[in-house]
Amino acid sequence: MSILEIIGRDQELFTSDIEFFSKEISERVKRSKFLVIGGAGSIGQAVTKEIFKRDPQALHVVDISENNMVELVRDLRSTEGYGSGDFKTFAIDCGSVEFEALMASEGPYEYVFNLSALKHVRSESDPYTLMRMIMVNVFNIIKTLRLANKMGAKKYFCVSTDKAANPVNMMGASKRIMEMFLMRESMTQDISMARFANVAFSDGSLLHGFNQRFSKRQPFAAPNDVRRYFVTPQESGELCLLSGLLGNNRDIFFPKLSEKLHLITFSEIAVRYLRERGYEPYECESEDEARDRAEELIAKKQWPCYFFKSDTTGEKDFEEFFTDNEDLDMERFETVGV
């Protein structure tokens, strides 16, 4: 299955910059120790793979998901083999005392990449998960940055989101607050960030849900009025790597808009996905109809779909990567704006 074809593209976004800076990136990776926080999530795994395949001096990965961490190790061993450097994984929370002990005993690290986040707009619908979102997206970032600074890290990278530009929901606002705190901390610690679009088929995403629905022979449901930019998992790792290794202090990287990157609706992706799998989408009038006719339609190589107008409170009508009052550098890279 071609992710690029499903999201309506035929070219990868960052190839030219990755190739142009390949030697510099590889040399920095080979002589450095890395800590990746949230490394077993979708973006975290992509970043870990980009670092691992360039044979770092040391690569330590932290994530609270023990199962995802096990799969990450299996994936790396199956695709990249074994590097010559020190590779370790730790199933711990970056906000815990165990993490502080890890930093004290396993550090120092030249580069700290923090990919941990609560990223779903729906997570702000109750006060308890919202409190957790603020803890993860703001306070844990500050804590881990100060620990990195204390041990003399060369760079602290943190992933942000396009929703931090003129935020309209608490998820985006929490990331914007994070950016503001990091700018303050940049007085004593070099930092860089990246804002980018939806990562196609990332854990918990609607596209990841398509995989789940397909494997369980269940109907597809998707909004037909929400248009989004999508990057592949590999592209998410490449953008983070470019920012973390080549970004100057306080830089925020984002994908340049071009003919390669364009908006596409979730319903369009659902149609492309099903046709890629050999099924013709059959649009139903309701979710009930889609559920009731699932077995009948699937047997005829048709897949029941229900497309609707979005009802998720706080969803942004459009996506943007920067605001009018931010200084832009569109010349330094071919495919990335800063």
Q: Where is each model-derived feature located?
A:
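Non-catalytic terminal and boundary segments that flank Rossmann-like NAD(P)-dependent oxidoreductase
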Residues: M1-F34
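Conserved glycine-rich cofactor-binding loop
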Residues: A40
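Hydrophobic/small residue at the entry helix of a nucleotide-binding pocket
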Residues: I43
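NAD(P)H-binding glycine-rich loop region in Rossmannoid oxidoreductase-like domains
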Residues: A46, E50-V61, R77, C94-M133
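Helix N-cap at the beta1-alpha1 junction of Rossmann-like dinucleotide-binding domains, i.e.
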Residues: D63-N68
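Rossmann-fold cofactor-recognition segment
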Residues: E80-S96
